[in-house]
Amino acid sequence: MEKKILNNLKMFYHAKSYLKGKIEVFSDIEGYNYIIKCIEEYVLMLKNNLSAKYTISFKGKCNNKSTLNFLFKDKGELDTISLTYDKTHNIETFNIYANIESYKFLKECLEDFVEDLKEFIHAELNFDSGINVDCDSPGIYFYHL
């Protein structure tokens, strides 16, 4: 079977209530660096929220073997990020602190994961983050077209 590199990602960024942006980024290194930059900015924004739990999941819908899940605990400052990485049923769980080293580690995991996604033939990506109880909550949404 022929391997297909992801052509582009459509990003929906909901930074505040009633503020939405839609940007297309290509599946090159600049595109992924841009996505990671948005994630970093979003994480900093989450630090200002005092009450909600956040889950960020990044997975290929047609292949559930590769999934990254980040759980942000409900504290004013982010205490830890729980990371579960399931790659072909090899599940690893990490607790990492919300400091610059953690973001570098998170970035490396995402970059590795993106490389895995390139192996999918017809992968649909859904990058979804936000607060479950409030539809107007901040969030970053990525859909592969």
Regions found by a protein language model. Give the residues of each.
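Positively charged, low-complexity terminal tracts
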Residues: 1-145
